[in-house]
Amino acid sequence: MFISSSSLAMIVETGRNGSEPVARIQYGQLYLIGSPQKDIVTEYAQERTHQQPENPFASLIPDQTIAIIPSFTLESGETLHNVPLAYSTRGRLSPNRDNAMVICHALTGSADVSDWWGPLLGGPGRAFDISRFFVICMNSLGSPYGSASPVTCKDGNPENGRYGPEFPLTTIRDDVKYGMYPC
């Protein structure tokens, strides 16, 4: 189930390069195509938490993980390298992988679901019941709280300086593809 805080829209399918889908939702179940045994972050993504010295905002979000995507091509055709993707999870993914709930944050939000939807997150009786669901929230492109944004270093290299106003324009499609990349 994919929930957007602005539209509560369901996203049915997306692909890494706009061609083959990496995940789909069918009859309420999340299917990771091609690799049902892989975890949310796979072998090609390095994991690090709170280790972005160039980005002081990344450490403001407790309990998030930052995966590094080696290469990511935007809808515009521009390719970013060593792209950080911050995300947080609550609950446990079931062996059948049929209990995933992906929540997208608002434009100015972060991957910390409990910060902005706290009253809905918890145990039985809550909308986001983490005793039943595996809740994951990925930080959107352009948000400074750990994901690729104007405050991150170009290509992940501090010697290149920060993107600043040169950070490329992104689309909702880019965010969907970016959020599904580690699957």
Regions found by a protein language model. Give the residues of each.
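Conserved phosphate-coordination/catalytic loops
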Residues: H81, T170-R173
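Conserved acidic catalytic loop of the alpha/beta-hydrolase fold
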Residues: P158-R162, E166, R173-C183
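N-terminal cap/lid subdomain of alpha/beta-hydrolase-fold enzymes
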Residues: S88-G156
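Generic structural hydrophobic/aromatic packing signal, biased to beta-strands
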Residues: A67-I69, C104, I136-M138, D175, ...
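Short, solvent-exposed coil/turn linker segments
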Residues: A23, I68-I69, S110, D129, ...
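Catalytic micro-motifs at enzyme active sites that drive phosphoryl/nucleotidyl and oxygen chemistry
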Residues: L74-G77, G122-R126, Y181-P182
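Catalytic-loop region of hydrolases
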Residues: F2-I3, S7-A100
